[in-house]
Regions:
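ATP-dependent carboxylate-amine ligase
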Residues: 1-132
Length: 132
């Protein structure tokens, strides 16, 4: 996010979609909420491999780090596809949409089951649907 903010102009907004993995370091979650809302024009909190945890619980832990002055700079959408869709819909032509977290992974792990989910595929699919 720092690298993006160093090169973007003041007219380009940064819209960040991110989440935290389940069954992992709980202490990092509030810090990620704080940083994402500080450094983004809009942060959209979503799921990222909730594993055996309730996605809403993970999101609440992330939200706990959002500072009061940044409450208007985020929203939470548990469905990752819908979160990406919201980011694309909100974006204007010069904006930057950062979908963070999954990288090369092509699945969402939920309750021990890996469900196919690829951020890149989803972005391309949604962009095609929304530009018709």
């Amino acid at each position: 996010m720092d690298s993006i903010n160093e090169i973007r102009t003041k007219n380009e907004r940064l819209i960040t979609v991110f989440g935290c993995g389940g069954d992992r370091d709980h202490a990092k979650r509030p810090e990620m909420g704080k940083i994402a809302t500080r450094k983004s024009t809009l942060a959209i909190i979503t799921t990222d491999n909730p594993r055996t945890e309730n996605p809403q619980d993970i999101i609440k832990e992330i939200e706990a780090g959002v500072e009061p002055q940044n409450f208007s700079k985020y929203t939470s959408i548990p469905d990752r596809r819908e979160a990406i869709k919201m980011a694309i819909k909100f974006a204007e032509p010069k904006d930057i949409v950062l979908v963070a977290g999954k990288g090369h992974e092509t699945y969402q792990e939920i309750n021990g089951v890996r469900h196919h989910f690829d951020d890149k595929e989803t972005i391309v699919e949604l962009y095609k649907l929304m530009s018709k």
